Amino acid sequence: MGKKRAREEVKDVPPTDVNMMDEDGSDDEDFDMVNVDFEWFNFDPEVDFHGTKTLLRQLFDVDANLFNMSALADLVLSQPTIGSTIKVDGKANDAYALLTVLNTAVHQDKEPMKDIIKYLVEKAQTNSSLAPIADVLSSGKHVGLVFSERLINMPSELAPPLYSMLVDEVEAAVEDKEPYNFSHYLILSKTYQELESKLDVENQKRKKAKEEAGMYYFHMEDEVLHKHAVAHGNFNYTKEDELAADSKRAFQEMGVKAHGHMILIEASKFPGAVKSVNEYLSAAQ
């Protein structure tokens, strides 16, 4: 799966059988395993605009409306030899997952990137653990801003080949004198915590104040990437609203509150971090 693809001509990685959980059972604990053939593709502006925009909106969560997501999708699609999509049933369908990187310095004057950089600097300044990120982004260095997102319930085993191919593609781009010689990689991600629903508290007034909720990762690989990071941590979304968890949850007993998350890794350590992700998720299977 980690085979490097030719840059001049798209060479799709062979389809991979991965088990996914089907949660449409009649009981909360009734899961069926479904075999799915995933296919890896380069970005294609002819077919990938809507799927790319949808996943980018999901990555930015409630703050997506702060940015021109159409312009961001176009920017991603403008460099089809960098990054990958994962699809089912052929290239013409929307992506189930994507991973790519944009050069913050090269694109800093373009509408989506300048707004995103300002946003990330402001968020980094709200958490002392993220302070190095604000410094790096404000320095004008060539930072590789990584966008990694996949549909909920997509298996984490898909992450290693996405990252491995990105490392290969960036290496080839640098050899071709393209502007991908980064000082750092900044991975934009998300975490979440389970919160006792405010509706439940109101309907069950005898309950005591909720205990501190645990923090969880949408992407398992983030925990591994932390070990190679200069800085990592959470930030609150600008438009967050805990009541949103009540409107989205249906039959769940717990609401879910998402947080933005950033991971900063020096470029020289990024290949080693990707290798660790491969080893960790391979061992977890």
From Swiss-Prot:
Alphabetized Pfam families for the sequence: BCCIP (PF13862)
Origin: domain of life: Eukaryota
Main location: cytoplasm
Basic and acidic residues biased stretches: 1-14
GO terms for cellular component: cytoplasm; nucleus
Localization in the cell: Cytoplasm; Nucleus
Keyword Signal: no
Entries under InterPro entries matching the protein: BCP1_family (IPR025602)
UniProt-annotated stretches for the region Disordered: 1-25
UniProt keyword terms in alphabetical order: Cytoplasm, Nucleus, Protein transport, Transport
Gene Ontology annotations of biological process type: protein transport
Keyword Aminoacyl-tRNA synthetase carried by entry: no
Known function: Involved in nuclear export, actin cytoskeleton organization and vesicular transport.
Family: Belongs to the BCP1 family.
Protein name per Swiss-Prot or TrEMBL: Protein BCP1
Source organism (scientific name): Gibberella zeae (strain ATCC MYA-4620 / CBS 123657 / FGSC 9075 / NRRL 31084 / PH-1)
UniProt gene name: BCP1
